[in-house]
Design a protein with these regions (language model features):
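Alpha-helical transmembrane segments of polytopic membrane transporters and translocases
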Residues: 15-36, 68-72
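Helix-loop junctions and terminal segments of transmembrane helices
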Residues: 34-53
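Short alpha-helical transmembrane segments in multi-pass integral membrane proteins
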Residues: 62-92, 162-188, 201-202
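Membrane-interface junctions at transmembrane-helix termini in multi-pass inner-membrane proteins
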Residues: 112-142, 152-153
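Membrane-interface helix-loop junctions in multi-pass transport and translocation proteins
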Residues: 134, 142-182, 192, 210, ...
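Membrane-proximal transmembrane or re-entrant/amphipathic helices at the cytosolic face
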Residues: 214-271
Length: 271
C-alpha cells in the first residue's frame, strides 16, 4: 500500500480499495496448497525410510509418486481457479460485485501461482528427504528477491499498479519450482522423467479448463450468472476424473502410499 500511496500518489482510501481487491484473490489462493501438505507428509517419510534402507529404487518411486500426486491435485485446482476466477468470486461475494469483478484479474494469476506453490511444497519435501535441506532455503531466497524486485517495479508502474502483485507472485513461485526441479535432477540419482511425469496431467488439465469455461458460457444463458459456476465446476471435475482414469494418469502405485491408499485404489479399480 505504501508504494501505491507514496509512488503513485493514491489516497489512502483508493490504495485500501485496490489492496482489498488483491486480498479477495489471496483468500482462495491459499486453499489448494492446504490439500498438498497431507500428500507430502505421507509420502516424503517413505523416501527417507527407503534411503535409510539403502533402497534407492524405492526412494525413486516414492519421489515420482509424491511429485505426480501433487501435480494431479494442483493442476486442476489452480487451473480451475484461474479460468473461473470471475464466476467463483461473484458466487462468494455477491454483495460487492464490482470488487469481485476487479479481483478476478488477481485470481486469474494467483490460481496459476498456487500450482507452483503446491509443487514447491512437494519438491522441498523431496530435497529435505535426500538431505539437501539447504537447497530449498536458497531457492526460496532467490524467489523472494525476484518477488521483491518485480513487485516494486510492477506495482510502482501506473499502468499496472496493484495488478502487478499477483504477476510477481507467479514469477516468484515459478522460479522456485524450476530451481528445485533442476536441483532434484542433479542431486537425485533416481530422479523421475519430468516429461513423463507432467505430460498427461498437463494435457488433461488443458481439456478440463476448456470444458469448465465452455460449459459455464453455455450454462450462464439458462441459469442465474451467480449459480451457473457450480454445475460448470462439477462438469470440470467429471471431465478431469474420467480422463485421468481413462488415460492412465493415476495408477495403483501412485496412491498406495497415501492414507487409505489401498481402499482408494480398490474404489477406483486402479491397477
Amino acid at each position: 500500500m505504501s508504494t501505491l500511496q507514496n509512488t503513485l500518489g493514491y489516497t489512502e482510501a483508493a490504495a485500501t480499495a485496490l489492496y482489498g481487491e488483491y486480498t479477495f484473490g489471496m483468500t482462495l489462493f491459499v486453499l489448494p496448497p492446504s490439500f498438498i501438505y497431507p500428500v507430502t507428509v505421507s509420502l516424503v517419510p517413505d523416501i527417507a525410510d527407503a534411503l535409510a534402507r539403502g533402497d534407492r529404487a524405492a526412494a525413486g518411486r516414492s519421489t515420482a509418486a509424491a511429485l505426480k500426486l501433487t501435480t494431479l491435485v494442483a493442476l486442476p485446482a489452480g487451473a480451475g481457479l484461474s479460468v473461473l476466477a470471475g464466476p467463483i468470486l461473484h458466487l462468494l461475494y455477491p454483495a460487492v460485485p464490482e470488487t469481485a469483478e476487479a479481483a478476478a484479474y488477481h485470481l486469474t494469476f494467483l490460481g496459476l501461482a498456487c500450482i507452483f506453490v503446491c509443487l514447491m511444497v512437494a519438491t522441498n519435501g523431496v530435497l529435505q528427504a535426500y538431505g539437501k535441506e539447504y537447497i530449498p532455503v536458497f531457492t526460496l531466497l532467490c524467489g523472494g528477491v525476484l518477488k521483491i524486485v518485480t513487485n516494486y517495479l510492477m506495482v510502482g508502474d501506473p499502468a499496472t499498479n496493484v495488478r502487478g502483485a499477483p504477476v510477481s507472485t507467479l514469477y516468484c513461485y515459478v522460479l522456485i519450482v524450476v530451481l528445485n526441479l533442476i536441483a532434484i535432477a542433479r542431486c537425485v540419482p533416481e530422479r523421475p522423467a519430468y516429461i513423463h511425469l507432467f505430460a498427461k496431467p498437463l494435457l488433461i488439465t488443458a481439456v478440463m479448463a476448456i470444458a469448465a469455461r465452455s460449459s459455464y458460457g453455455v450454462l450462464v444463458r439458462c441459469l442465474p450468472e451467480r449459480w451457473a459456476v457450480l454445475p460448470a465446476i462439477l462438469i470440470a471435475v467429471v471431465v478431469y476424473g474420467v480422463l485421468a482414469l481413462a488415460l492412465g494418469a493415476v495408477t495403483r502405485a501412485d496412491v498406495i502410499g497415501l492414507p487409505k491408499g489401498e481402499k482408494i485404489a480398490e474404489i477406483l479399480h486402479l491397477r
